């Protein structure tokens, strides 16, 4: 059974006194073999840090101590310094847990634009996704939790080992993102998936009504995932950029970070408003 509540503990969020340009929310499902990678990525985020125009917010569920924490990442801060709230164990595969994190972020750190990053393992949509992925890379890819026995509509992201391997399947993700749209009164500006196999047209089609731009990889990601220091330093320096511009920068930063070590990777940004055009073209082509 999925958990639907959060036991609050620790400190309280410091409500932002003004509206920022961006709130960058990272939902980190680290209750699995990515726990250490989560801490490294938080350290990368702290190299940039939040500013008056950019809030960097994280919710991390860890496997090591079975706690969930919320952070506002500051420059030079990180896991030990920036924790705002601490809860008991949560199930990252429960849509309500994701929704609660976003609502907390929106209520306390309002902004002109919002980016939501889903951080974990992903299993995309297509049955043959694993066979199409890149071969062994220099660093271990995030592949150990792929679930290819599920029906396509049930392929997932944000797996939680201590909640029976529960995850957000594509239908749950569609519903919770629709709820977030209602909360915002508009589409989410940018949805990022720092996970394997998630940036497929089939996934984007299900999410098209809730997000403006989608960023992710259609094949496996290495364990190191996104280069958050580079991504967020640019956002902090240019906080007035729109979602499409920011998405292009994420893609360029990701590809450049692996080019130097010679790894085969993919990352792309999709204009979700054009997904219906792709769908119509596919239908006409195959009729």
Question: What is the meaning of each model-derived region?
Answer:
Residues 43-47, 76-78, 135-138, 210-213, ...:
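Short, low-complexity, polar/charged sequence segments that are solvent-exposed and flexible
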Residues 23-27, 55-60, 114-118, 189-193, ...:
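Structural recognition of the beta-strand scaffold that forms the well-ordered cores
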Residues 2-17, 140-287:
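Terminal, contiguous helix-loop blocks that mediate binding/assembly
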Residues 34-38, 65-68, 124-128, 198-203, ...:
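Extracytoplasmic/secreted cell-surface and envelope-processing proteins
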Residues 22, 104, 119, 125-126, ...:
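A residue-identity detector for tryptophan
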């Amino acid at each position: 059974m999925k958990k639907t509540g959060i036991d609050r503990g620790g400190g309280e969020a410091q409500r932002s006194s003004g509206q920022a340009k961006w709130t960058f929310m990272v939902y980190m499902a680290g209750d699995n073999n990515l726990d250490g990678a989560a801490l490294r990525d938080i350290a990368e985020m702290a190299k940039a840090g939040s500013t008056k125009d950019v809030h960097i917010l994280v919710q991390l569920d860890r496997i090591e101590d079975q706690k969930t924490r919320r952070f506002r990442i500051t420059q030079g801060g990180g896991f030990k310094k920036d924790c705002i709230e601490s809860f008991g164990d949560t199930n990252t595969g429960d849509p309500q847990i994701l929704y609660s994190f976003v609502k907390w972020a929106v209520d306390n750190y309002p902004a002109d634009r919002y980016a939501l990053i889903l951080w974990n393992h992903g299993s995309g949509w297509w049955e043959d996704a694993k066979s199409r992925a890149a071969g062994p890379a220099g660093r271990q890819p995030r592949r150990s939790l792929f679930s290819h026995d599920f029906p396509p509509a049930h392929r997932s992201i944000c797996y939680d080992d201590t909640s029976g391997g529960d995850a957000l399947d594509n239908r749950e993700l569609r519903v919770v993102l629709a709820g977030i749209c209602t909360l915002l009164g508009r589409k989410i500006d940018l949805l990022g998936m720092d996970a394997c196999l998630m940036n497929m047209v089939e996934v984007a089609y299900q999410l098209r009504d809730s997000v403006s731009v989608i960023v992710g990889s259609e094949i496996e990601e290495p364990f190191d995932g996104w280069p958050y220091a580079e991504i967020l330093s640019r956002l902090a320096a240019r906080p007035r950029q729109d979602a499409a511009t920011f998405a292009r920068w994420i893609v360029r930063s990701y590809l450049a970070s692996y080019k130097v070590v010679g790894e085969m990777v993919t990352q792309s940004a999709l204009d979700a408003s054009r997904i219906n055009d792709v769908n119509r073209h596919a239908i006409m082509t195959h009729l």
